[in-house]
Amino acid sequence: MQYEDKNGVNEPSRRRLLKGIGALALAGSCPVAHAQKTQSAPGTLSPVARNEKQPFYGEHQAGILTPQQAAMMLVAFDVLASDKADLERLFRLLTQRFAFLTQGGAAPETPNPRLPPLDSGILGGYIAPDNLTITLSVGHSLFDERFGLAPQMPKKLQKMTRFPNDSLDAALCHGDVLLQICANTQDTVIHALRDIIKHTPDLLSVRWKREGFISDHAARSKGKETPINLLGFKDGTANPDSQNDKLMQKVVWVTADQQEPAWTIGGSYQAVRLIQFRVEFWDRTPLKEQQTIFGRDKQTGAPLGMQHEHDVPDYASDPEGKGIALDSHIRLANPRTAESESSLMLRRGYSYSLGVTNSGQLDMGLLFVCYQHDLEKGFLTVQKRLNGEALEEYVKPIGGGYFFALPGVKDANDYLGSALLRV
């Protein structure tokens, strides 16, 4: 069911404003309430935070360089479109929904109560932008024979295959398209997903879904504080500076000199890995061994033998690995050689917690997400270096896939994937 919406943020309705004025009047009659009226209730965001928004139009999609929000969801879909025209309809529709949801506005009213409501209603009558980003990526399978797109497939895009330590569940792998939905709060993420599914019943079918989180204080630091994963270590310390445009052109974005299809310029290769942690086993492992495995101090995040989280380890002066073990995670992931400079990538991972496994173990771990201009030089090269690392005893990749994050939407007349479908 279609309806018209506005991309700009609308003010709450008159009724809601009057209700708010009435509540303030009651609060003013109570000295304690009056003294605390500028504070947000525990566990809630301030009105300013709820109205934070990221720009939707631009050369690149939001949600890649955007400082990590507190809540995240990965949703892979199978595309039900029957031909290229249907696929264009899907991408245009997704663009319209993303534009509205990320900028906020009044929830649509349902003209006929005998019909299903036009909105789920879980955010109330006003849909605050809440720092929402929705990033659309396409998988290897979208370039099969259905839509005639095979000649336009990104050169390095491929189906994810098993690494030695993987225990992949087919139900948690791959997808024609992937949505990365992030916001300040989980309810905004869920609302966005339900809106998208409601508008695409004949075009998309959910393949798998996982929800993630980082701490509120890490999210509110706008990238200045490194999130801590569920093994208790800082996750993403060695990330390249996402505010350095020149560096991001080198590390994250596909550029014109890469001999890729022209439509891919401004996009990025995305690797997704759903990694289960053996947290009970980890929690019984001595601290010294944990730190040796990672190569970092658990509390400060500093490389072993150093003082601060962002101190750069000097492996050349420690060739035998007496300070930082040769098979430590940080040393294998980034040996800091001239050759390893080409395998830099931007990580954007989140923790997850799902309950218990069939064996009665806690089901929690990491939703690993990274972006790079070249999948083979980036994630695949790094993962090959990590094969056999000591950390493998405590982690088990169970799903994910490789995708290509589409370039951004130029303006209101453009749509996601337009350059791909116009070829």
From Swiss-Prot:
Variant or mutagenesis effect after changing residue 236 to F: Loss of deferrochelatase activity
Subcellular location: Periplasm
Coiled coil spans: none
Binding site for heme b: 236-238, 329, 334-336, 347
Impact noted for substituting residue 349 to L: Loss of deferrochelatase activity. Great decrease in peroxidase activity on guaiacol and catechol. Still binds heme
Reactions catalysed: heme b + 2 H(+) = protoporphyrin IX + Fe(2+)
Post-translational modification: Predicted to be exported by the Tat system. The position of the signal peptide cleavage has not been experimentally proven.
Stated consequence of mutating residue 351 to Q: Large decrease in deferrochelatase activity
Record note on what altering residue 346 to W does: Loss of deferrochelatase activity
Co-factor requirement: heme b
GO cellular component: cytosol; periplasmic space
Keyword Iron attached: yes
PROSITE patterns (UniProt xref): DYP_PEROXIDASE, TAT
EC number(s) given by UniProt: 4.98.1.1, 1.11.1.-
GO molecular function: ferrochelatase activity; heme binding; metal ion binding; peroxidase activity
Signal peptide limits: 1-35
Cofactor comment: Binds 1 heme b (iron(II)-protoporphyrin IX) group non-covalently per subunit.
Effect ascribed to mutating residue 329 to A: Loss of deferrochelatase activity. Great decrease in peroxidase activity on guaiacol, and loss of peroxidase activity on catechol. Still binds heme
Phenotype upon changing residue 223 to F: Loss of deferrochelatase activity
Effect seen on changing residue 235 to A: Large decrease in deferrochelatase activity and peroxidase activity on guaiacol and catechol. Still binds heme
GO terms classed as biological process: iron import into cell
Database matches in PANTHER family: DEFERROCHELATASE, DEFERROCHELATASE/PEROXIDASE
Function: Involved in the recovery of exogenous heme iron. Extracts iron from heme while preserving the protoporphyrin ring intact. Also displays peroxidase activity on guaiacol and catechol in vitro. The deferrochelatase activity appears to be closely related to the peroxidation activity, but the link is unclear.
Quaternary structure and interacting proteins, as annotated: The heme-bound EfeB forms a homodimer whereas the apo-form mainly exists as a monomer. Part of a ferrous iron transporter composed of EfeU, EfeO and EfeB.
Family to which this protein belongs: Belongs to the DyP-type peroxidase family. EfeB subfamily.
Name of protein: Deferrochelatase
Gene (name only): efeB
